[in-house]
From Swiss-Prot:
One of its GO terms (cellular component) is plasma membrane. Residues 665-884 form the Ras-GEF domain. The keyword Repeat does not apply. It comes from the Eukaryota. This is Rap guanine nucleotide exchange factor 3. The DEP domain is involved in membrane localization independent from regulation by cAMP. 3',5'-cyclic AMP binds at residues 311-314, 321-322. GO terms for biological process: angiogenesis; associative learning; cellular response to cAMP; establishment of endothelial barrier; negative regulation of syncytium formation by plasma membrane fusion; positive regulation of angiogenesis; positive regulation of GTPase activity; positive regulation of protein export from nucleus.
């Protein structure tokens, strides 16, 4: 071995490497934490002068020319927490990406032999490469779940970041252009056509697709702040919402940070980021990797990981660095905020912030905002208003009551404030606390009644009570489907009704707020006769009659409802119990105790179609409605759990329904699916996720329907043995997706498209080749809506252009709510983080927007759905559209779409797919 300063002469150290098998080449990323005595590396370090932050090169002889560069010596104490580079997760991920790159390289060469070739550009020859545009075209043409060019660019960026793809000029950003050339490193892979390699390729593309959005985000961060686009700034802001280091900052600060964040990568473990005593100029957030915190005298103090931050004191004062920060692993990425940028942001935000204090404590924080302002949009002069940032629940409610206006429009900021509060109050202000506060405000007198006339005093009280009634009216309209079973709520409403009945002005106001009272009012004005019982009622009716449920809640599962619990025994016999939907496992077991052949000591578990068993905790509730697709409940002795086998019905059908589907046109099938989905979607309440005693069975039922549809598509295609019929069925499913999109049923549209992109279906190359060019072109156009890049930006833009009624892509909406909840603290300095509530309300309000015109037909069959149930003979009359070719009755089709039978075991689908096309 030879040691040298970079660029200088070498000198010999120790015996040759080939004579010391104990050493070998260290893992990429630097020296191990402990160097054994007597090894060659130990002797090298003993003879080398080791000043801080000096780099060396170790050049190995008797091998092909290579060296390890950038080795740094840092005095670290030996610790059990030292990272073992040889088994690091990062290296394992890199290996998977390299393997995926080789598989993709092999498949591209087999499919497009002329893709990789010599290129000549501007009088220069580039050997064995392809252009960025051709590479993206090739990946899209493979049909492996990549639906858009931006998604393919993300995959290529992942390969480029990990070294599985190289730019001929070593640029770090992948560009989808003809004049940018890339090559796969290493020798050309040998062609192979085994089924195992094909499955590995599908898994590899799934891995690359999963990491693609992160790679695109990294590209946006690497750009200089002044070159970032509006979309990139929004993407960075959304990423900041999920970083715990900035969770305490307001959204205004986060938006400003998105414009000044700098990306700082470091490749080698052991690199000193800064040393104790250095001048602090930046704040660091760990985006990837980990660091060790070392101080003089104490050595290793702690280890920081992804999401942690350090150096923030440097932004507050000019104190020197209190510790030394050393990279703990390779390839660490940091988000850096320079002091001058952060101080400017904080100064600007503080200038817009107003704090209200009571008894020496802050109880309300307001921020002056400009309407229309954003991270990349300048504020509009003269359109400033104050919004609530945080506060105590009581002060937020008090401000809301003061800000409400009787003549406000639906788009007024005050109305949005009211909606935000009502949709989220259960998170920070339970209903009992809200009732108490409202009754207190109803009775409260002005602070200084002598300051005005008696008429002004009376007007003030009346106006405030009117605001309370408006708020309660909106609250009742939102929560009315759940209030009949809430004795506390009904008691509060009765108390308020008694108080209102004593004031004629308030009674008249309340009478005009409710449709039932408006009808009575029209009758009393001469439009009809009113019964004496109606005239005798002085107390306003807050809730609709329980016998006349709201249209949106018809058929919804409520807290007190009983649902069937189908419980299997090990011998596959089934026992059905009817229990409350929110019954706990303990209550289910107690009900089973009254049945024969049941012994104490048995447990309740759920089993899926693959035979996987999951135990259920005694306190778990709603297990019947929360079962996944093809899951069943089993009661079994603990020692027999591992012997359980799925019920035969869980395995799915063995024969397809292609003959039946041939009798129904794609348009009419889409109409029936949309009718059924709309019924399920309309039963979901906007706020059921946030209420403690409200079941989520309706939401779970709708989500299970999504999974059912995508596996239904894959099941029917895999169970169609005739190639011609299978191609015809594939064509129908593509047209079905197009009609679902046209009918604005985006949830089922995504489900059908996901089913078509299932690996068991996408591999059926001969079936896809049978499709006409026009149909394949239609499928490619539909795939663009599935593009997940930039946080599903294509879908979100398309959704904003649709007028209601719409059935949105529900999994994405739930993901948004989950990310908002987990990425933001509910309490900030012991105050309610109302910014978080505002974001959650905005996401949940999408449900209301999509259903705001629920009476409009979504499909050609919408107006005839009721007749299907009422009169089976009448339903035989054709209800198809003019262009429909259906010969099957709508009633039988309706029954079919409600009870789809599917195979959800991916291994079984893959097996069937290989039998169709080996």
């Amino acid at each position: 071995m030879k040691v040298s300063w970079p660029g200088e002469n070498h000198w010999q150290v120790g015996p040759a490497v080939v004579e010391s098998p104990a050493v070998g080449a260290p893992q990429v990323g630097g020296l191990p934490d402990v160097v054994p005595e007597g090894t060659l590396l130990n002797m090298v370090l003993k003879r080398m002068h080791r000043p801080r932050c000096c780099s060396y090169q170790l050049v190995f002889e008797h091998r092909r020319p290579s060296c390890i560069q950038g080795l740094r010596w840092t005095p670290l104490t030996n610790s059990e927490d030292s990272l073992d580079f040889r088994v690091s997760l990062e290296q394992a991920t890199t290996e998977h990406v390299h393997k995926a790159g080789k598989l993709l390289h092999r498949h591209l060469l087999a499919t497009y032999p002329t893709l990789i070739r010599d290129r000549k550009y501007h009088l220069r020859l580039y050997r064995h490469c392809c252009s960025g545009r051709e590479l993206v075209d090739g990946i899209l043409a493979l049909g492996l779940g990549v639906h858009s060019r931006s998604q393919a660019v993300g995959i290529c960026q992942v390969l480029l970041d990990e070294g599985a793809l190289c730019h001929v000029k070593h640029d770090w950003t992948f560009q989808d252009r003809d004049a940018q050339f890339y090559r796969f490193p290493g020798p050309e892979p040998e062609p192979t056509g085994t089924q195992d390699v094909e499955e590995e390729l599908v898994e590899a593309m799934a891995l690359l697709s999963q990491r693609g959005p992160d790679a695109l985000l990294t590209v946006a961060l690497r750009k200089p702040p002044g070159q970032r686009t509006d979309e990139e700034l929004d993407l960075i802001f959304e990423e900041l919402l999920h970083i715990k280091a900035v969770a305490h900052l307001s959204n205004s600060v986060k938006r400003e940070l998105a414009a000044v964040l700098l990306f700082e990568p470091h490749s080698k473990a052991g690199t000193v980021l800064f040393s104790q005593g250095d001048k602090g100029t930046s704040w660091y957030i760990i985006w990837k990797g980990s660091v060790n915190v070392v101080t003089h005298g104490k050595g290793l103090v702690t280890t920081l990981h992804e999401g942690d931050d350090f150096g923030q004191l440097a932004l507050v004062n000019d104190a020197p660095r209190a510790a030394t920060i050393i990279l703990r692993e390779n390839n660490c990425h940091f988000l850096r905020v320079d002091k001058q940028d952060f101080n400017r942001i904080i100064k600007d935000v503080e200038a817009k912030t107003m704090r209200l204090e009571e008894h020496g404590k802050v109880v309300l924080v307001l921020e002056r905002t400009s309407q229309g302002a954003g991270p990349s949009r300048p504020p509009t002069p003269g359109r400033n208003r104050y919004t609530v940032m945080s506060g105590t629940p009581e002060k937020i409610l008090e401000l809301l009551l003061e800000a409400m206006r009787p003549d406000s429009s639906a788009h007024d900021p005050t109305e949005t404030f009211l909606s935000d509060f009502l949709l989220t109050h259960s998170v920070f202000m339970p209903s009992t606390q809200l009732f108490t506060a409202l009754l207190h405000h109803f009775h409260v007198e002005p602070a200084d009644p002598a300051g005005g006339s008696e008429q002004e005093h009376s007007t003030y009280i009346c106006n405030k009570r009117q605001q309370i009634l408006r708020l309660v009216g909106r609250w009742v309209a939102l929560y009315s489907p759940m209030l009949h079973s809430d004795p506390v709520a009904t008691s509060f409403l009765q108390k308020l009704s008694d108080l209102v009945s004593r004031d004629a002005r308030l009674s008249n106001l309340l009478r005009e707020q409710y449709p039932e009272r408006r009808r009575h009012h029209r009758l009393e004005n001469g439009c009809g006769n009113v019964s004496p019982q109606t005239k005798a009622r002085n107390a306003p009716v807050w809730l609709p009659n329980q016998e006349e449920p709201l249209p949106s809640s018809a058929g919804a599962i409520r807290v007190g409802d009983k649902v069937p619990y189908d419980i299997c025994r090990p011998d596959h016999s089934v026992l059905t119990l009817h229990l409350p939907v929110t019954a706990s496992v303990r209550e289910v077991m107690a009900a089973l105790a009254h049945e024969d052949h049941w012994t104490k000591g048995q447990v309740l578990v759920k089993v899926n179609s693959a035979g996987d068993v999951v135990g259920l905790q005694p306190d778990a509730r709603g297990v019947a409605t929360s079962l996944g697709l093809n899951e069943r409940l089993f009661v079994v002795d603990p020692q027999e759990v591992h012997e359980l086998t799925p019920h035969p019905e869980q395995l799915g059908p063995t024969l397809g329904s292609s003959e039946m589907l041939d009798l129904v046109s794609a348009k009419d099938l889409a109409g029936q699916l949309t009718d059924h989905d709309w019924n399920l979607f309309n039963r979901i309440h906007q706020v059921q996720e946030h209420l403690r005693d409200v079941t989520t069975a309706n939401l779970e039922r709708f989500m299970r329907r999504f999974n059912e549809l995508q596996y239904w598509v894959a099941t029917e295609l895999c169970l169609c043995p005739v190639p011609g019929s299978r191609a015809q069925l594939l064509r129908k499913f593509i047209k079905l997706a197009a009609h679902l999109k046209e009918q604005k049923n985006l949830n089922s549209f995504f489900a059908v498209m996901f089913g078509l992109s299932n690996s068991a279906i996408s591999r059926l190359a001969h079936t896809w080749e049978r499709l006409p060019h026009k149909v394949r072109k239609l499928y490619s156009a539909l795939e663009r809506l599935l593009d997940p890049s930039w946080n599903h930006r294509v879908y979100r833009l398309a959704l904003t252009k649709l007028s209601p009624p719409v059935i949105p892509f529900m999994p994405l909406l739930l993901k948004d709510v989950t990310f908002i909840h987990e990425g933001n603290h509910t309490l900030v300095e012991n105050l309610i983080n109302f910014e978080k509530m505002r974001m959650m309300a905005r996401a949940v309000r999408m449900l209301h927007h999509c259903r705001s015109h629920s009476t409009a037909p979504l499909s050609p069959l919408r107006s005839r759905v009721s007749h299907i149930h009422e009169d089976s003979q009448g339903s035989r009359i054709s209800t198809c559209s003019e262009q429909s070719l259906s010969t099957r009755s709508p009633a039988s089709t309706w029954a079919y779409v409600q009870q789809l039978k599917v195979i959800d075991n991916q291994r079984e689908l893959s097996r069937l797919s290989r039998e169709l096309e080996p």
